[in-house]
């Protein structure tokens, strides 16, 4: 390069060209451009940006030598530098790049390296320095200087040392001076994402005032630095430019100003550049070139090594293929033999399993056929029910069309419901065989025509019967009129039923013979009933209770008599409780009607029946017009009622006809009557049977020729078909639509606004302690497991279980109502025993007893007693000089004299009693004296006083202390007048704030029944008799206490009170008694206990709440109806009414009909009767009790409609007061759940418009169990039961797993023993071949090879299971390898292996090269990637005893696999054949998801009977292989003797052994 530059400067003189290889080398190693760019970047001066012309500034630094070579050499970098500096000074964008990056881009990159987000004015100079290129130039310059290793002058060394000392000085100063610590993180904070400089400064300096002072100090320091810099500049004129430049850089570090623009940059000389270049070349030659050469050599050696390894592996594979080909030729015959043996085993197992499985499959097919027949019968019954409903709908449509004069637009829609849209059904049975059930022959058009014909015939028959009845009635009436005209008592009115005067839609006025004013809705109801009568249609008047159904019926009969001249006979049938009400209403509103009350005893009814003459009926002068009777009497006297042709039959409370199988329903249906009217306050029943019953009753013509529906409900087909819900939802709604034209229902809130309001209040009562004990005792006897088991039983068991459970429910309800219902408290007395007296002889009495009443002896005993007063005196005050101790020395310190001591011990019980009283009295004074009266100076005395030995007073629990301290009074058993048994926690409830609080350690008194406890046995004390007069006297004195005064003190407390006690009856204010008479019990001294009436109230929470409620209601002037379901409870309520002196009346099922009328009338007319006790069933129907304004349900009924009827006895027309209904409910008991169920029942009634009688016996066992158990308790028990069941299943699973392991181990052991025997006998075992990677499924001749499989099942997640003892398919496993079982769970995870291109398979074009449906390239080989033999094993060791063992294991596993495949195939074939034998159409095109996928025809070859899908359970344990004998996918074998490849290609489906 130097030569070229020199030639260019000499004026273009030519030089010889260098050799070509030198030019290539120079061109490859040319670094001119790189060096220029590097020098421009690193040699640029810091102040180059401030200079105007970089080129001019750089020229003076060039050496002054006039060598043009040096100038030319230095010119390019200087010009480049000048261009760079010029561009920088002009403020334009840099046009050159620094290492390929623009200068503006480098500044942006530098800005990204620092955090300038919180940078303020004081640190702006750091930003300019960090973003400028000066630091890089200085660093590059310093690096160049270091590389050049220039020798430092003495002055430069001194400067460096001075700067180092200066630096250390300021570092020490910074560390000591706390004010300088504010500059911590001054520049280091810019390198972090979070700049802590200002936070540190604020922490050290505090407020801003201090900062201002610091800034002033800083400015002063900066002035000093500037002055010092000026002095250095003056001195620098004598120093070298290098030192000056170094100092400016140093001062720039301590100041905010850049170095002055006058400084010049020093440039290197040519010699220095050449030396640096030579140094770089030496480094390249010495270091880089040898390193590159070594890397190339190592790479070549590695390549050669890999090539050798690859060649070795290729050689080994080719050798293995050759060996394998030779081995295949030898093993062809043994393989064929083994194949034949396995096929024989396969068919043997096939036939065995087929026979066994066929029997089981035939049994299953028979059961399936029975089930299909049952389903078909259920479907037929359902179609029959649909046919009957459709037929009834058509009949109702004809009737309503006639009545409403409508058009025939709904007929086709009704008939369309007979169409059957069911399709052919397929069922997957256990074996996976698809069964096609044959379609039944159902012609919807035929049934449509049949239903239409039946409905039209029934309609015409009904019309004909109506006309016939009218004609007969006309003739009977004419005959009666002729007879009356002859006698002159009749009238000449003519009437024709054929031409009625009333037309549909005409408004009918109120009859004039009706005394009263009908309301608007009642008049509409009468018009509707009259219209039904004209058309000959029966109807149901289902107005809500209390709206006047009775009045509307009477008005209809009055209308017929007045407008149509039909005076009967009319038959009214009602419950026994409303008979008198009907009689009263007829007498009140239509007095012209002659009403015949048909009830009483048989003799009375016989007398009444004398007026039943057909000749005298049908006229106004008939002996009777209306007959009123009850349902019971109709059934009893049915033969008499059937003789009369009734014009109108009215059935009150028609819900009694809910069952079509009842005798009452059948009898009433046989009556001869023109029209029937059903009155019911409850809606239509909510079961299909009850709806059918009502339909049949109001439309008997339609069902006279049909008996199917009776059989339908007797067999309970709905539950048997198990589709009851569908029938209920669809057909139940259709039945309601059928009844709609014949039913009229209004409710109170829609038609009547004059009725007062009705308020219902739930009163929750707490159980008493006695009730809780009984309730819990009953609950403890219940076995929840038995309940759950009984509730889950069959339908036959449900009926028996429900009755027993309902009995249990009634016991709980009894306890809730009153414990007396469950266990009545009777009068109780102990067992009294009279002991025989003991007879004592006179001699024994006189001489045998120690103490007798002998006064002379007693006197001497008192004189000689040690307690004699003179003896005590002598012992205390003995003579002087005798120092004897006395046993009575303590008397002087307890304040008792010798005489008092003698009286206490010798004068008897009375004296001791008096002494005890005086001592207790004195103890009070002594206690007060010791507590309050002791002076301070006498607190320490020397001698004892006369009361110092009375220490009992000082005891904390002494009687005076207990009486004076209120805390000690409350101690247990510290007082004789309190029955405190302990301290316990009490919950205090506050009614106003509805809160409760717990108070601990409160006094707990003994229960009252413990205080009046009576002994079980009592007896008079044993008495003795003696044949001695003195003995009797002494016995009498002893019984009286020794003296009369003692007796008086014991009984009366004092002798003075005895006279007052005897004269107490004559005194107006007698003195209170004392002694034993004052503590006489309330019930006397006798132990006989008679339960009080107060306990009758307090023992029941409900009765206690009722007592409080009745007291309040009586004071406010209300009158009350009390309903209860239990007559025994009404008996208890009667006892309560007598005890509280409430006037009451009682009506229940035992009341006579005549008495009921009088009781209702008395309650309505007499205001002094406060309470009416009624049973819910007997007193809740039909009667009018509007005099009462309060209804109390002591217990709720199962059916909410029954309670609704009962409360409507008071809330009905005529009630002017507000009616309040109270319902008593025991909290937390079975009654809450019964009430909840009743609410759900009423909600269903409102939704479906179908209410009805809810009988307890219709409850299911599960529903009764839900009443007995709480939801939480039931859930807890069920959870425990499920947990126990789960644990039991887990235990059984473990046992089953253990049993299978033992069975498998035993089987394995037997197989091993069998193999050992065969080995000893010398049986030739054929070692199976190990196929190579190239010819996996081919023999030497290209034949398909048989692949045997392991009999063990694979992992459920594995795709391939490869055993070390059985190498399947094309897995190239080394015989000497010790690898064990390999399970590949994900074939996609293994990398595909490349195959050799020179394999025989690829040459011959084999079609099948897969194992288990997976290509060999996708299967990881056990031996692939390893050497031909295992480590440490010599060559040629592959055929060892271990290999023989492998062959034996393979043979056994292959046989077991064949047997298993044959068994499964036989089972599949047996199942298909068995179902086909019972008439099922078995489809051969079975989907892949079927569990058993096999053809039903026995195959002629091996490829015809195998499974056809990889997902079949009959496939191989290698789950996708299907490698079993007979698989058409893998057993594409031909004879081993046919080497032709054409035969191999066309050999699919052929049998090498010629079939079986």
UniProtKB/Swiss-Prot annotation:
Skewed-composition ranges (Polar residues): 1390-1408
UniProt GO MF annotations: actin binding; alpha-tubulin binding; ATP binding; ATP hydrolysis activity; ATP-dependent activity, acting on DNA; ATP-dependent chromatin remodeler activity; DNA binding; histone binding
Temperature impact on function: Optimum temperature is 37 degrees Celsius.
Stretches the record annotates as Assembles INO80 complex module consisting of conserved components ACTR8, ACTL6A and YY1: 212-526
Main subcellular localisation: cytoplasm
Tissue specificity note: According to PubMed:10574462, widely expressed. According to PubMed:16298340, specifically expressed in brain, liver and pancreas.
Biological process terms in GO annotation: cell division; cellular response to ionizing radiation; cellular response to UV; chromatin remodeling; DNA repair; DNA-templated transcription; double-strand break repair; double-strand break repair via homologous recombination
Function: ATPase component of the chromatin remodeling INO80 complex which is involved in transcriptional regulation, DNA replication and DNA repair. Binds DNA. As part of the INO80 complex, remodels chromatin by shifting nucleosomes. Regulates transcription upon recruitment by YY1 to YY1-activated genes, where it acts as an essential coactivator. Involved in UV-damage excision DNA repair. The contribution to DNA double-strand break repair appears to be largely indirect through transcriptional regulation. Involved in DNA replication.
Assembly and oligomerization: Component of the chromatin remodeling INO80 complex; three different complex modules assemble on different domains of INO80. Interacts with DDB1. Interacts with transcriptional repressor protein YY1; the interaction recruits the INO80 complex to YY1 target genes. Interacts with YY1AP1. Interacts with tubulin alpha.
Name used for this protein in its record: Chromatin-remodeling ATPase INO80
Organism: Homo sapiens (Human)
């Amino acid at each position: 390069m130097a030569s070229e530059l020199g030639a260019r400067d000499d004026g273009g003189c030519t030089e010889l060209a260098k050799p070509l290889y030198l030019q290539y080398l120079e061109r490859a190693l040319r670094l001119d451009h790189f060096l220029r760019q590097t020098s421009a970047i690193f040699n640029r001066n810091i102040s180059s940006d401030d200079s105007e012309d970089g080129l001019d500034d750089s020229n003076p630094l060039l050496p002054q030598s006039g060598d043009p070579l040096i100038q030319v050499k230095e010119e390019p970098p200087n010009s480049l530098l000048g261009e760079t500096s010029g561009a920088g000074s002009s403020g334009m964008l840099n046009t050159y790049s620094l290492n390929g990056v623009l200068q503006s881009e480098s500044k942006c990159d530098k800005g990204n390296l620092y955090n300038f987000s919180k940078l303020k004015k004081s640190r702006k100079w750091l930003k300019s320095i960090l973003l400028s290129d000066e630091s890089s130039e200085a660093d590059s310059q310093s690096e160049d200087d270091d590389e050049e290793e220039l020798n430092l002058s003495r002055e430069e060394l001194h400067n460096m040392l001075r700067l180092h000392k200066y630096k250390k000085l300021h570092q020490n100063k910074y560390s000591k001076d706390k004010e300088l610590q504010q500059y911590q993180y001054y520049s280091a904070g810019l390198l972090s994402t979070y700049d802590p400089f200002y936070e540190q400064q604020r922490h050290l300096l505090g407020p801003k005032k201090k900062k201002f002072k610091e800034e002033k100090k800083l400015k002063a320091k900066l002035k000093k630095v500037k002055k010092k810099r000026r002095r250095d500049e003056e001195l620098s004129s004598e120093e070298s430019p290098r030192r000056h430049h170094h100092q400016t850089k140093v001062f720039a570090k301590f100041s905010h100003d850049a170095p002055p623009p006058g400084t010049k940059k020093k440039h290197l000389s040519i010699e220095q550049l050449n030396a640096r270049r030579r140094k770089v070349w030496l480094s390249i030659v010495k270091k880089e070139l040898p390193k590159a050469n070594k890397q190339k050599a190592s790479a070549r050696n590695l390549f050669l090594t890999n090539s050798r390894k690859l060649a070795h592996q290729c050689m080994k594979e080719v050798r293995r293929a050759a060996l394998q080909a030779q081995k295949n030729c030898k093993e062809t015959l043994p393989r064929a033999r083994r194949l034949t043996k396995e096929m024989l085993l396969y068919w043997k197992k096939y036939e065995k399993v087929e026979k066994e499985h066929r029997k089981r499959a035939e049994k299953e097919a028979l059961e399936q056929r029975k089930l299909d027949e049952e389903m078909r019968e259920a479907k037929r019954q359902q179609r029959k029910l649909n046919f009957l409903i459709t037929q009834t709908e058509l009949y109702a449509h004809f009737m309503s069309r006639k009545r409403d004069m409508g058009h025939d637009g709904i007929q086709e829609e009704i008939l369309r419901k007979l169409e059957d849209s069911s399709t052919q059904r397929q069922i997957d049975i256990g074996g996976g065989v698809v069964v096609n059930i044959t379609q039944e022959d159902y012609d919807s058009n035929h049934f449509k025509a049949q239903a239409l014909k039946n409905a039209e015939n029934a309609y015409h028959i009904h019309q004909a019967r109506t006309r016939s009845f009218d004609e007969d009635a006309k003739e009977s009436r004419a005959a009666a009129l002729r007879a009356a005209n002859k006698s002159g008592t009749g009238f000449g009115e003519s009437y024709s039923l054929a031409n009625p005067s009333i037309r549909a839609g005409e408004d009918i006025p109120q009859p004039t013979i009706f005394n009263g004013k009908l309301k608007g809705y009642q008049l509409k109801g009468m018009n509707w009933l009259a219209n039904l009568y004209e058309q000959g249609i029966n109807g149901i008047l289902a107005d809500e209770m209390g709206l006047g159904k009775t009045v509307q019926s009477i008005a209809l009969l009055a209308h017929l008599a007045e407008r149509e001249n039909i005076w009967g006979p009319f038959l009214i049938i009602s419950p026994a409780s409303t008979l008198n009400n009907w009689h009263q209403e007829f007498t009140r509103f239509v007095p012209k009607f002659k009403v015949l009350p048909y009830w009483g005893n048989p003799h009375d009814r016989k007398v009444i029946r004398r007026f039943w003459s057909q000749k005298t009926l049908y006229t106004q002068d008939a002996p009777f017009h209306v007959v009123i009777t009850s349902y019971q009497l109709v059934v009893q006297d049915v033969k008499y009622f059937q003789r009369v042709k009734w014009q109108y039959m009215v059935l009150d409370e028609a819900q009694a006809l809910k069952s079509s199988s009842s005798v009452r329903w059948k009898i009433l249906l046989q009556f001869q009557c023109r029209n029937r009217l059903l009155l019911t306050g409850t809606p239509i029943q909510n079961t299909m049977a009850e709806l059918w019953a009502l339909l049949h009753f109001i439309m008997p013509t339609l069902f006279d020729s049909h008996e199917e529906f009776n059989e339908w409900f007797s067999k309970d087909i709905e539950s048997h078909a198990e589709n009851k819900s569908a029938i209920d939802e669809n057909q139940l709604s259709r039945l309601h639509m059928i009844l709609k034209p014949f039913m009229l229902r209004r409710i109170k809130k829609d038609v009547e606004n004059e009725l007062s309001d009705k308020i219902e209040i739930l009163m929750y009562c707490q159980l008493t302690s006695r009730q809780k004990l009984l309730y819990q005792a009953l609950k403890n006897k219940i076995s929840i497991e038995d309940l759950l088991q009984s509730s889950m039983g069959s339908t036959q068991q449900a009926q028996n279980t429900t009755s027993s459970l309902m009995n249990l429910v009634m016991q709980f309800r009894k306890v809730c109502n009153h414990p007396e219902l469950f266990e009545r408290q009777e009068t109780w007395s102990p067992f009294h025993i009279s002991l025989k007296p003991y007879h004592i002889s006179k001699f024994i009495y006189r001489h045998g007893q120690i103490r007798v009443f002998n006064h002379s002896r007693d006197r001497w005993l008192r004189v000689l007693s040690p307690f004699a007063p003179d003896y005590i005196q002598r012992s205390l005050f003995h003579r002087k000089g005798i120092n004897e101790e006395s046993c009575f020395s303590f008397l002087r310190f307890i304040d008792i004299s010798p005489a008092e001591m003698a009286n206490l011990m010798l004068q008897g019980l009375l004296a001791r009693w008096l002494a005890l009283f005086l001592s207790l009295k004195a103890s009070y004074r002594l206690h007060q004296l010791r507590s309050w009266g002791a002076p301070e100076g006498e607190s320490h005395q020397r001698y004892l006083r006369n009361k110092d030995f009375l220490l009992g007073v000082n005891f904390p629990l002494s009687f005076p202390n207990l009486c004076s301290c209120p805390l000690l009074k409350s101690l247990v058993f510290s007082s004789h007048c309190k029955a405190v048994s302990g301290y316990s926690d009490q919950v205090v409830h506050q009614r106003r704030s509805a809160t409760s609080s717990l108070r601990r350690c409160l006094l707990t008194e003994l229960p009252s029944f413990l205080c009046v406890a009576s002994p079980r046995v009592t007896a008079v004390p044993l008495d003795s008799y003696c044949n001695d007069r003195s003995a009797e006297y002494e016995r009498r004195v002893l019984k009286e206490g020794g003296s009369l005064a003692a007796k008086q003190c014991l009984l009366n407390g004092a002798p003075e009170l005895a006279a007052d006690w005897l004269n107490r009856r004559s005194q107006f204010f007698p003195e209170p008694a004392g002694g034993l008479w004052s503590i006489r019990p309330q019930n006397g001294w006798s132990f006989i206990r008679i339960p009080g009436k107060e306990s009758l109230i307090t023992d029941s929470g409900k009765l206690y709440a009722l007592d409080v409620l009745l007291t309040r209601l009586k004071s406010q002037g209300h009158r009350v109806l009390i309903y209860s379901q239990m007559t025994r409870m009404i008996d208890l309520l009667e006892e309560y009414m007598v005890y509280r002196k409430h006037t009451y009346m009682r009506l229940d099922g035992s009341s006579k009909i005549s008495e009921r009328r009088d009781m209702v009338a008395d309650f309505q007319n007499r205001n002094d009767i406060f309470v009416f006790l009624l049973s819910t069933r007997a007193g809740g129907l039909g009667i009018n009790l509007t005099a009462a304004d309060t209804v109390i349900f002591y217990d709720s009924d199962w059916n909410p409609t029954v309670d609704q009827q009962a409360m409507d006895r008071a809330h009905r027309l005529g009630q002017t007061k507000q009616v309040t209904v109270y319902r008593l409910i025991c909290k937390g008991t079975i009654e809450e759940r019964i009430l909840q169920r009743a609410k759900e029942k009423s909600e269903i009634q409102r939704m479906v418009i179908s209410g009805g009688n809810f009988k307890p016996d219709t409850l299911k066992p599960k529903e009764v169990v839900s009443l007995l158990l709480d939801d939480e308790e039931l859930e807890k028990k069920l959870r425990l039961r499920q947990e126990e069941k789960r644990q039991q299943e887990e235990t059984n699973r473990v046992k089953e797993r253990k049993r299978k392991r033992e069975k498998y181990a035993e089987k394995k052991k037997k197989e091993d023993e069998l193999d050992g025997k065969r080995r000893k006998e010398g049986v030739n075992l054929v070692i199976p071949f190990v196929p190579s990677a190239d010819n996996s499924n081919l023999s030497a001749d290209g034949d398909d090879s048989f692949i045997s499989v392991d009999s063990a099942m694979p992992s459920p997640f594995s795709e391939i299971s490869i055993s070390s003892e059985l190498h399947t398919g094309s897995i190239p496993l080394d015989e000497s390898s010790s690898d064990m079982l390999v399970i590949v769970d994900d074939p996609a995870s293994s990398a595909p292996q490349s195959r050799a291109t020179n394999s025989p398979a690829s040459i011959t074009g084999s079609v099948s090269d897969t194992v288990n449906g997976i290509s060999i390239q996708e299967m990881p080989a056990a031996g692939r990637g390893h050497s031909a033999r295992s480590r440490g094993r010599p060559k040629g060791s592959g055929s060892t005893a271990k290999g023989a063992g492998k062959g034996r294991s393979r043979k056994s596993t292959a046989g077991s696999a064949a047997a298993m495949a044959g068994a499964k195939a036989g089972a599949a074939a047996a199942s298909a054949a068995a179902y086909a034998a019972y008439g099922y159409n078995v489809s051969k095109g079975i989907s892949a998801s079927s569990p058993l996928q096999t053809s039903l025809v026995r195959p002629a070859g091996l490829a015809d009977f195998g499974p056809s899908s990889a997902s079949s359970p009959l496939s191989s344990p290698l789950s996708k292989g299907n490698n079993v004998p007979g698989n058409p996918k893998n057993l594409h074998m031909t004879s081993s003797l046919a080497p032709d490849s054409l035969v191999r290609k066309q050999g699919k489906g052929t049998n090498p052994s010629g079939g079986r």
